[in-house]
Amino acid sequence: FLEKLSLLWLTGSIYPVQESFMSCLIRQKLMVAIEQLPFPSGKNLRKFILYLPEGERQELSVLFMHYLLKSRNIQVIYLGQDISINDLRDACKFHQPHYLFTMITEAFARESVQSYIDKLSENFPDAQILLSGYQVIAQPVQAPHNVRILNSLDQTLAMVS
């Protein structure tokens, strides 16, 4: 649905305000669904931090990931949009996640996607970093040892199962 919505917007078949309205409705539904899930419980739970890097605003896919993870009894901390590496470092010091997940759909203005991936790997050597999004999939990026590129929803679902 979201891909069709984006395609309609790109081809001028709908107005940006219509796409924004639909995105807000979907966001609200996802937030309610996430809140209705029980808080993960048990020993040795996997812990994820989800976030969007600086300049990223397309959060529906990350919210969907939040829902998928929490529905599988996985602890999730969603930091939100426009998160700097420094802020992410502070959050990781406090929460000590096993995994970091983000999506990179917009082109970075200040640095290359490869440079950003390398910084993530260097700054968070103890976490498994999971990346997806158009900019990561469409470009030939080199994934360091602790970085995994998720090319599809099927790959993502297999990883969280």
Model regions and ranges:
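Long amphipathic alpha-helical segments
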Residues: 1-36
